[in-house]
């Protein structure tokens, strides 16, 4: 998967597997039994890691490895998924149904950042766009962002945008609530790729003085 993103010309990559923390592409990872279909995870070789992170075969333009990545609430039917970055929380946690709040709170305690994933999947605004304007959802998500400064934002595009097509409207509604309180909400666009043919559907641009993990972390927040 990492190789596929490198071939697709990406410059930054965070691996956020369901309930599995990735502490670097060369590190061993513990998957979650039957939920992960007992898959064997093969760490990247040091040779390939150097080639990709230094861009040895694409003109010196390496791809940065973002560590501490995970998708929390891995097993919930309601799909209240939350991405964690630079975190130690979430390994093997099955999650709580209909709950977007617990993961950001716990990720903040662990010193990481979080992003709310495809909230339209839960709100069902892909099919019913007017739900993005319902006060019950606006108040719920605004409360999370106000209470958790390390919850940086929300996806407004996920994969092919089928479930997030109404999330731009919800994002706009939320900004009107939180900005007067001194808070911003960044918008994210993620592949949510679980298969190689899903690579390259969504991406973000980062303004960086130099492409490295520390600068990416700062840019995500600032």
Show the residue positions of the predicted features.
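Charged catalytic cores and adjacent phosphate/nucleic-acid-binding surfaces used
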Residues: 1, 77-88, 129-222
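A metal-dependent hydrolase metal-coordination microenvironment
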Residues: 1-129, 156-171, 190-193
């Amino acid at each position: 998967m990492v190789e596929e993103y490198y071939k697709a010309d990406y410059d930054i990559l965070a691996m956020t597997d369901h309930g599995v923390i990735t502490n670097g592409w060369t590190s061993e990872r513990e998957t979650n039994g039957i939920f992960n279909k007992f898959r064997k995870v093969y760490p990247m070789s040091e040779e390939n890691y150097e080639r990709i992170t230094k861009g040895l075969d694409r003109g010196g333009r390496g791809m940065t490895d973002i560590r501490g990545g995970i998708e929390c609430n891995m097993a919930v039917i309601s799909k209240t998924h939350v991405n964690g970055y630079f975190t130690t929380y979430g390994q093997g946690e099955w999650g709580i149904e209909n709950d977007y709040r617990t993961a950001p709170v716990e990720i903040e305690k662990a010193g990481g950042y979080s992003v709310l994933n495809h909230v339209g999947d839960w709100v069902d605004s892909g099919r019913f766009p007017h739900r993005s304007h319902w006060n019950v959802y606006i108040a719920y998500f605004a409360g999370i962002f106000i209470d958790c400064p390390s919850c940086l934002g929300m996806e407004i595009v996920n994969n092919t945008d089928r479930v997030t097509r109404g999330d731009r409207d919800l994002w706009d509604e939320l900004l009107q609530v939180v900005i007067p309180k001194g808070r911003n909400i960044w918008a994210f666009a993620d592949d949510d790729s679980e298969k190689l043919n899903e690579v390259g559907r969504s991406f973000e641009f980062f303004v960086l003085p130099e492409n490295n993990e520390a600068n990416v972390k700062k840019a995500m927040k600032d």
